[in-house]
Curated annotation (Swiss-Prot):
CDD domains documented for this protein: Ribosomal_uS17
UniProt KW Amino-acid biosynthesis keyword: no
GO biological processes: translation
Pfam families in the record: Ribosomal_S17
The UniProt record lists the keyword rRNA-binding: yes
Gene: rps17
GO MF term (any one): structural constituent of ribosome
SUPFAM superfamilies for the chain: Nucleic acid-binding proteins
Taxonomic path: Archaea, Nanobdellota, Candidatus Nanoarchaeia, Nanoarchaeales, Nanoarchaeaceae
Assembly with partners or alone: Part of the 30S ribosomal subunit.
Name of the protein in question: Small ribosomal subunit protein uS17
Protein keywords: Ribonucleoprotein, Ribosomal protein, RNA-binding, rRNA-binding
Family statement drawn from the similarity comment of this UniProt entry: Belongs to the universal ribosomal protein uS17 family.
Leader sequence segment: none
Amino acid sequence: MKLAELIELPKEQCNDKKCPHHGHLKVRGFFFKGKVIKKSDNKTVKIEIIRYYWLPKYERYELRRTRITAYLPECLKDIKEGDYVLIGETRPLSKTKHFVVLGKLKKGIALTQ
């Protein structure tokens, strides 16, 4: 799938250098879909990713969750807690931020794909 089919592209222009759409930030590596669980004032969001992990001893799956800190560009400031977003790996932006929010997922996109 192409990126434009998964996310809603930003409608407004921004002057953020760390924006993957309007700035000079290159996205490479892993892409994850997750839920925004916390939004800070300093352009930071915390994303929760839920995955299934196979336990061979019990022959069952268990849910495991990972929380990732990501950078939120100015043009995507309408994203709020509870929204599902797509994030991409990039160069280290700070001590804890190595991912950037690419956009809000469109309705009907499954999180497990």
